[in-house]
UniProtKB/Swiss-Prot annotation:
SUPFAM superfamilies: Adenine nucleotide alpha hydrolases-like. This is Adenosine 5'-phosphosulfate reductase. Catalyzes the formation of sulfite from adenosine 5'-phosphosulfate (APS) using thioredoxin as an electron donor. Residues 1-39 are annotated as: Disordered. It comes from the Bacteria. Keywords: Cytoplasm, Iron, Iron-sulfur, Metal-binding, Oxidoreductase. Belongs to the PAPS reductase family. CysH subfamily. Pfam families: PAPS_reduct. It comes from Deinococcus radiodurans (strain ATCC 13939 / DSM 20539 / JCM 16871 / CCUG 27074 / LMG 4051 / NBRC 15346 / NCIMB 9279 / VKM B-1422 / R1).
Length: 255
């Protein structure tokens, strides 16, 4: 059974604790087809539908702009579940600080960090694997830990922050993806970067400060650069590696 760092929404905060996560039995959920959501549908309505259809809904997040906006909308819509983050050992300090700021802002949510305390020297992967085989590095440090956790927890659906304008590889993302081990619900599928930025500014959300330095999509520091004018938001990820996705949402091992 995986050990995860869990930040619980106790009265007044409470210390950081490390405890084994027991598998939860997935509650029954409505096996209903998704409604015909459209570009003008309020994302909170999509989240409320997802909560009704999937009471065991779970939200992975890397706390990029999309993720921060979705987290705020989800809290408004009544989501009170887990926000699961994978510490690869290569995250920017600003990303970890953003996680901590979000945890303080949303005490009603439970923040779970998998691989807590990971570092480049922890022996999980060979040195510089990110350069020689980025797919293998992502699989070992990001995809596999989350896959194992989801297998233990057994959610029937995931709440995800991807949007169509992030990259050409995401241009056809639907609000609800079927197939695979579980549904993926994408309430922000039709939101533009301008909408996300406006919402974050209006609600004074704790956006990763690297975003304002041109890092429009932020992953691990060895494989992330600032985006150039006119590039997709995800163009700074694995630049020059012929790779556009970490493997969580596309490919044979997708969630």
């Amino acid at each position: 059974m995986m050990t995860a760092e869990v930040r619980t929404p106790e009265q007044g905060g409470g210390p950081l604790t490390t405890e084994p996560r027991a598998p939860r039995s997935a509650p029954g959920h409505a096996d209903a087809s998704a409604p015909a959501f459209g570009p003008e549908t309020d994302p909170r309505d999509i989240i409320r539908w997802a909560l009704a259809a999937h009471p065991d809904l779970l939200m992975p997040s890397a706390f990029n702009l999309n993720g921060v906006v979705l987290l705020d909308l989800a809290a408004q819509a009544g989501y009170r579940g887990e926000v699961v983050f994978v510490d690869t050992g290569y995250h920017f300090p600003e990303t970890l600080a953003t996680r901590d700021r979000l945890e303080s802002r949303y005490p009603e949510l439970t923040f779970v960090t998998l691989n807590a305390g990971a570092s480049p020297d922890d022996g999980q992967t060979p040195p510089d694997l990110y350069a020689s085989d980025p797919d293998a590095c992502c699989a070992a440090r990001k995809v596999d830990p989350l896959q194992r956790y989801l297998k233990e927890q057994g959610p029937s659906a995931l709440l995800n922050a991807r949007s169509r304008d992030q990259a050409s590889t995401r241009a056809d993302i639907p609000f609800v993806e079927e197939g695979g081990a579980r549904r993926r619900v994408n309430p922000l599928a039709h939101w533009t970067r301008e909408q996300l930025e406006a919402y974050a500014a209006e609600h004074d959300l704790p956006v990763n400060p690297l975003y304002f330095d041109g890092f429009l999509s932020i992953g691990c520091w060895p494989c992330t650069r600032a985006v150039k004018p006119g590039e997709d938001a995800r163009a700074g990820r694995w630049a020059g590696k012929g790779k556009t996705e970490c493997g969580l949402w596309q490919g044979e091992n997708k969630l």
